[in-house]
């Protein structure tokens, strides 16, 4: 379940007992439910493409960071990824969270990091 749209939190079935609310999982009211037929890597990749397209370009970290993230996800999609790429995604997340001007940049890595943490086999 994707809570609060692409920039929110992606939950696996094991987490369905968590509370929706500011004390645990804050939400803007949007929920997307995926069944087993959906490839969670492709879901995250689609969200990354969306963030890259929607970046206004005002700040360099977001403009370049979302493009680099899109490139890394496309590289993984083509089967050319390596463990180094996962480390790069972590570095991009730190950069985007600390240096981006707005929320889009701050949360652009969320779908990737959440799906890596909860649906790792989708990346292999």
Regions found by a protein language model. Name each.
Residues 1-124:
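Redox cofactor-anchoring modules in respiratory/redox and cofactor-processing assemblies
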């Amino acid at each position: 379940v994707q809570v609060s749209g692409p920039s929110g939190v992606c939950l696996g079935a094991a987490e369905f007992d968590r509370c929706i609310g500011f004390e645990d999982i804050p939400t803007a009211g949007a929920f997307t439910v995926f069944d087993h037929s959906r490839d969670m890597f492709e879901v995250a990749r689609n969200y990354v493409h969306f963030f890259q397209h929607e970046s206004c370009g005002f700040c360099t970290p977001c403009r370049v960071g979302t493009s680099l993230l899109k490139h890394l996800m496309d590289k993984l999609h083509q089967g050319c990824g390596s463990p180094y790429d996962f480390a790069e995604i972590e570095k991009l997340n730190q950069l985007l969270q600390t240096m981006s001007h707005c929320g889009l940049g701050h949360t652009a890595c969320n779908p990737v990091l959440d799906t890596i943490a909860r649906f790792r086999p989708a990346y292999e």
